[in-house]
């Protein structure tokens, strides 16, 4: 019989079993607040590890991007096909203040728009708002039959497509460059830009289902807490002003006697 260690006999581990720790014990919940351009400001909650040493919780939350359905923000199920991206800009107490960071369509909505016998026309343009945000806007539209048309198809000619695309770019640039980001987001919700494009291109070729399908923020200005508070509607000139206590209250407090003293 060979003398040596029997490898089958398991050796006891040092320290024994480790206690199962709850991963949420060292984390805190924060409320996500949307800009006041949307009807519902309470988006939801997010988790972050508590402040430990040099790791500050609020710094870990900044620049987080949240994707929210516009139907939840507006309380309207008809807007469920739009996805709004919000980026955390600042943390105040347990509230995470966000700002608009982009918009997109759901895949099923885009696929439902594409059909036979019509021409798809797309355009995109880089624009700069009055508050120095640089955005890239993508537009999509489809041709439709003219009034009293018997022909099944409604294809546009190449020259007409170029004219329509030129109009799309022109309207998107004019609409975005004449307002700030907050006002521009307010235009995206009711699709007022899409309706204007439909009206402007009706003389070239009638269009239907014209949407600003995607918006990307390419460049943002330097962070300004004052502008962020204006976007959230919580900004006022009386922030940090010391309030004097009414004289009547102080007099009443002085006259009160303790019973049984």
Curated annotation (Swiss-Prot):
Keywords attached to this entry: Cytoplasm, Ribonucleoprotein, Ribosomal protein
Compositional bias ranges of the Basic residues kind: 1-18
GO biological process per UniProt: translation
Region of interest called Disordered, as start-end residue ranges on this chain: 1-21
Location within or outside the cell: Cytoplasm
Highest taxon in the source lineage: Eukaryota
Secretion signal, residue range per the UniProt entry: none
PANTHER family named in the record: 40S RIBOSOMAL PROTEIN S3A (PTHR11830)
Subunit structure: Component of the small ribosomal subunit. Mature ribosomes consist of a small (40S) and a large (60S) subunit. The 40S subunit contains about 33 different proteins and 1 molecule of RNA (18S). The 60S subunit contains about 49 different proteins and 3 molecules of RNA (25S, 5.8S and 5S).
Protein name: Small ribosomal subunit protein eS1
